[in-house]
Structures are given as C-alpha cells and as structure tokens.
Amino acid sequence: MEEQATYRRIAVKIGSNVLTRSDGTLNVTRMSAIVDQVATLRHMGVEVILVSSGAVAAGRSMMRRRGVAPLDAVSERMLFSAVGQVRLINRYYDFFSDRSLTCGQVLTMKECFSTRHHYLNQRHCMNTMLAHGVIPIVNENDTISVTELMFTDNDELSGLIATMMECQALVILSNIDGVYDGNPDFPQSKVITDIAHTDVPNAASFIQKKKSSFGRGGMSTKFHIAQKVANEGCQVIIANGNREGILLDVVRGNRKVPYTLFHAAPQPVSSLKKWIAHSEGFAKGEIHVNEGASQALTGETASSVLPVGVTRIMGEFEKDDIVRIVAPDGTTIGYGRAAYSAAKARTVMGCKAKRPLVHYDYLYVE
C-alpha cells in the first residue's frame, strides 16, 4: 500500500550551508540525499518546488581555484553566479535523471514580481511544469539582478514562491535545527517546536542576528519570512538540512526529530493579497492616515482606506500601483493597490462619502 502524504504541494528552500562544504565546494553527497527524499515525496503524490541556493558558493570555489583577479563585490557575484549556476543545475539534472525524474531551471528576479501580470506569468510557467511532472528548481538570477532590488536572500524568494504557488507548506532547510529559545551555541538552549501566529512576538525575542557563512541571510530573515507566510495560510518548517532523512521526517510529521513548525493562520488570504503582501519593495507612494483610521485598519473588522481618514499623500503613483499605508507614528500598517492616482487622491483627501482609496479586497495589513 502506497504511503499518503499530508501535503499536496510543498516548496523546499535549501540553504547554501546545506549544499556546500566548508571550503565552498558543492556537497554532492548531501545534494544526492535531498534528491532521494524529493523522489520519495513525488512517489507519495507530493508536488515539490525546490528553491536552491549554492550557485554563488559553487562558482566562488571554481573560480578561486583558477586564481581569478580581485573584483568588486557586484562583478564577483555575477561571475560566481554565472559559473556556479551551470554546475549546480547540472548536478541536479544528473541526480534527478538517475531517479527517472525531470527537473527544470527557473531563474527569476525581484522585478519579476513587481506587476500582477509578471507574477501570474511566472505562476503559469511553474504550474505547467508541475502538471507535466517536472520539478522546478528556482534561484535568483544574480547575473543580472540589480543590487538595490535583490531579494534579501533565498528565504525571501522561497516565501514568495510558496505563497504564489499556493503550497500547503514551506520547508526551509538550514544548518541548525530550528528556532531556539536562546543562543543555539549554548547547551541549555532548546528548539521551539511550535509557533502559532499569536505566539510570534514572544518567539521573536529569541532570534539571533548572526548570518550564515555562505548565504546573505540569517535566522532573523527566516523568522520574518516564516511569520509572514504562515499568516497568509501556509505552514512553515525550519529544519536542519544536514540531518539524514529530514525532509521526509517533517512531511510525515515525525516530532521525534527537532524542528520548528510555524502553524498557518486559520483563514488564508486570497491569491491577490498574497501578491500584495510581498510587494513592499515596489510601493510607488504612501498614504498616511489618522489615528481613527489606523485603529480601524488594524482592528478585527475588515476595513478599507477611506479618504476621510487620510492626512497626507506622498509620492506620485497611478491607479493600481502598490502603495504603503502609514500610521500616525510612522509605522507601516500594510500595503494595498491604489484605486486613485496620487493626484486624484489629493483632491478627495479628508472628504466623506467617497469611494475607498484602497479597498479591503486589495489591502494587506501586516
């Protein structure tokens, strides 16, 4: 009898410290073990999307063996990524082929998520791949990404992919067992096994700011992304990718193995709101609101951004652009899609009985 899985579709982010050895070379033994687990999941009926780091680290190792001349940081990243991505995807292709599976490469950039059209086009591409039994392997296209518009790291990218593709779970494989209740280097520290969306403020106080050896991010980034994705209705698991069989353990719910599970919010948000939630980097302007509007927007009842509660419009945006909603103290309330241009918004600001500047259906509150 075939084993049935809890999830229909998952995204798996594999960190640089899982895929590379201390000298920066690819850990092909670990890659093969992860591919083995993905193959098992496919036989269980689970669709798997891989978000894989490792290209820059692999390219760095290869080029430094050749004695490459010193480069500026941007040129170095582009060179290492271009060389390393070929090596990385070739390894994946060979490993999956050995298991009678087909993988496909998806290179993307933050700008590719900036408009709803581009967002849906990417989703269609990956849905087509999955429908034909192809395992997408996603990475940021570091060769042409503009530094100012790069993802924080692949944790951020994996969160976008998981929500865009309506995954039931996002598994972030790192080099530690999860979120700890203290410094992971201290023996008395323990892994926090479960974090509900209501427990996030307490758990956040334990987060260390330290970054990984080869990646751009750290646990702080992972925690932030996990919190956001879980609030959007997708479970998030942070686990140690160096543990044997860890991917199968977390999918099967084996709690004898240490890992942190962020429980999904009971009410998932719409596909459109998921896109808006991850569009903060593309906000074209700001809508500042008064205290009454701020309380209404962050309360339990669904509320739109009404002109009567608006105190200031900043920036020049057009209808349907993403805008940031700002509280009186300067903090971000959320993001939404503008129903007016900035020029039109200024003419109705403070007025009653006008249609919303941002309707609730197009508003994501953080």
Where is each model-derived feature located?
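C-terminal catalytic "cap/lid" subdomain
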Residues: M1-R77, S81-E366
